[in-house]
């Protein structure tokens, strides 16, 4: 019987750049580091590129790049920051994907991710499509190959999202066990209810979609993943390995894969020295002849699904109420502020949805005067974001415009695309995840909203801000009255920084 182990790490930080300056400003809560990207890189992303393995005498016997042996995804916006600020770590991650491909039968371990961590079931169809395309194109530019799998933010899923992934050529994604509804053997047998996390997580499943397409799904081992993320498994790498081995069963007379998925930041940021426990665990498994490490692409090629699965629609890995954490006061919170209310989430979502619809309407109307296919151009705009050189910009418009554009028309076309980009960044999931609307993550998505509204006003003199702020008044804060007050205190001053800088420079 063939036994395999796969450890997946979801490595992600939200986009943190000031949308007017294009830089990450100092974040005092990340002290002694400049900002949270810098701090978490020092505590997690960098250590995992060169993690020491210790012997019984606490001597270093080997230093390993953990990314070469695990399955992983990095958020595109995080990699963009890392490429500019920690090129050493960035290059080590890219190299790890190449080395993992050599190790795992030509299957690199890196997965793509939806671009800015938008909760896909709550997005409209055009945003779902663009987010997936941007994630794929970003991945191709960095890893120089097409991704086999794609991570969905918060593992939040619905059938339409799976349809889009399958249509784009994505072979698989990873979900939590309680996101499976029922299973059956392919070709015969009856459907069997596996809701409540009762699915067998030791094999791949085929999800057949209404369009006739299909996509493979892996449902991770929930109990072991929970122990890694919130228990004490990372106190000892050997115990970590033993726990993974306990996931196999002699009752299954077939190949098995025991696989787990957690936030990658668990290995060093949330759990100090977690990278070392991971390194020792992987080292221990490497020297165990009864089992071998694999990644999802390799396993899927060798052992295609024998069973079909239907998902629980609008479900995720981090909200017991489906996807309500990102649009309502469902009861999910960090636990750090007992007694606080998250009743601000619904009004914030309503304000963002209203703004998105206004922005999209402006884009659709004016972009059609310049572009042959405004939606396709938006999907391709990631190419300019990845390479904003003047030559690339010119070629981009030559390809997508339906006539030669004058200088002012080109400028307006790019403003329209930047407006659309910011209107998608407002949906970064962290804006709703935490406990109060005044948190840095929520303020950040409101800054993207302000930038989108600013561009809309520059383009057509349409002032969206008064209505947006009025809607924010309905979002109560546990600290600062309401969302409108927070917008006034924490968003508007940042919007004025570029103007102040310009005036001082003369």
Task: Go through the PLM ranges and name each one.
Residues 2-9, 14-126, 130-131, 146-152, ...:
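Short, well-structured secondary-structure segments
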Residues 2-55, 77, 191-228, 232-506:
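Active-site and substrate-binding clefts of carbohydrate-active enzymes
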Residues 64-66, 144, 167, 212, ...:
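Alpha-helix termination/capping residues and helix-transition junctions
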Residues 91-104, 108-109, 133, 145, ...:
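Acidic, His- and aromatic-enriched active-site or binding-groove loops in soluble protein domains
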Residues 128-152, 245-261:
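CE4/NodB-like, metal-dependent polysaccharide N-deacetylase domain
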Residues 130, 134-141, 160-163, 167, ...:
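Alpha-helical scaffolding segments of alpha/beta enzyme cores, especially the outer helices
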Residues 151-159, 265-268:
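Gly/Ser/Thr-rich loops at beta-strand to alpha-helix junctions
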Residues 154-161, 180-184, 300-304:
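Beta-rich nucleic-acid/ligand-interaction surfaces
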